[in-house]
UniProtKB/Swiss-Prot annotation:
Belongs to the bacterial ribosomal protein bS20 family. This is Small ribosomal subunit protein bS20. Disulfide bonds: none annotated. Residues 12-22 have a biased composition (Basic and acidic residues). It holds the Pfam family Ribosomal_S20p. Residues 1-25 are annotated as: Disordered. The keyword Ribosomal protein applies. Binds directly to 16S ribosomal RNA. It comes from Nocardioides sp. (strain ATCC BAA-499 / JS614). It comes from the Bacteria. The gene is rpsT. PANTHER family: 30S RIBOSOMAL PROTEIN S20 (PTHR33398), SMALL RIBOSOMAL SUBUNIT PROTEIN BS20C (PTHR33398:SF1).
Amino acid sequence: MANIKSQIKRNKQNEKRHERNKAVKTGLKTAVRKFREAAEAGDKDTAVALGQDAARKLDKAASKGVIHKNQAANRKSAIAKKAASL
């Protein structure tokens, strides 16, 4: 455990950020999974709506710095490609 005040504060901040980032990533995984399930079931209307929701969450996560912007772009591209093939 750190003895320096600034490092103690940093540890607290890092723990808070870790929890927040984990929550955002969990929400992302859920959104993408729901889209994939709808796409595999062949439900085009639902899949398109869920794809838009997943893309929105990916953009938000990238803007918050939870994931890299290129990773968000790659995932959005894959979602759009899968939605277009339905």
